[in-house]
Amino acid sequence: MIDKEARKLETLEKLLGIPRQWYSQMSRGELPSITMPTRTKRNIEYDEDTEVWKYGDRERLREAGSEKSALHILKMAYVIWFIRHQIKESRSSTLRELYYISEGWKKAKFAAQNDSNLLIEDLEILTDVQREQFNLRPEEDGASIFGPLRIREETRRGSKDIHCGDDVGEAGYQIPTNVEKLEFLEHDAEMVIAIETGGMYARLIENGFDEKYNAILVHLKGQPARSTRRVLNRLAKEFELPVTVFTDGDPWSYRIYASVAYGSIKSAHISEILATPSARFIGVQPSDIRDYDLPSDKLTEQDVSALKSELTDPRFATDYWTEQINLQLSLNLKSEQQAFAARGLDFVTDEYLPARLSSMGVLRR
């Protein structure tokens, strides 16, 4: 792993390169400015080398020639100053705390937390450094992981080796916000299953699915945090394990899968370390709703609109997704993971998952 002090110095050097650029611009009689990629669906392109979606060539120049742009650059200067101080003092803060700290910055204070969050993303893009290296973290923690995986966690009190099955309770090991502090030591796994809901995650653990099939189980906790996606990315890359995603059968859950496999518009600048392009979708598939006659609900207008939007989303531009989404629109139904319980509490682990994983070529027994 990279030396902590070297990483700190590298982060500071990249961060301070921004105000140095402004100083050079003003020394030449120019207005200070920054150039950023436009963060829209139209500027997302597929990178064949990395197999993830990234920002394209469309850029936006923000120059201090208007009050709005000048204020943005002023706020960025304050945030850089704050992060510099935080790194030097080996302190950390949440994104929420940063927003409240800005209350004392007079004209540079943020009107809403979303504004400060977006500015941090700007700094990530400009420096090619993750916010975790700025010692900034979100309010929410990463989710949980359970199964045959041994890790080493670096903390303020030193390092500690943890087995994510033997050394934790049935809630699993809680993924920290900064996954770079983890070293993956060894495993006895044949697959990774990322699970949307806590109920299904607990069902697989209670039924011993992790032991029977040597599976690492990861609770996504809904739309997964960056730390959770980073863990999946590392498990796929470092151990070359097949990663699968098991969600509810609705358009919002398909987007959870897409964020794991291909990345999102919001984090397209770090798709290479967050996305897992080899990740495959288990279900709940629209065809499962039909074939297993699962208890279901009618699609809402918002569901229908979201499904139609996904038909034009480049992340779903495959024959498989086109067929499944059109089938769901035809069925006009959606189902939850827990709907399999209608066939018994063991059905999902004894019948559905083994059959589905075998058909995908993930399970070979």
Roles of regions detected by a PLM:
Residues M1-P242, P251-R365:
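Nucleic-acid enzyme cleavage-core boundary/entry regions
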Residues D248:
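Glycine-rich phosphate-binding loop
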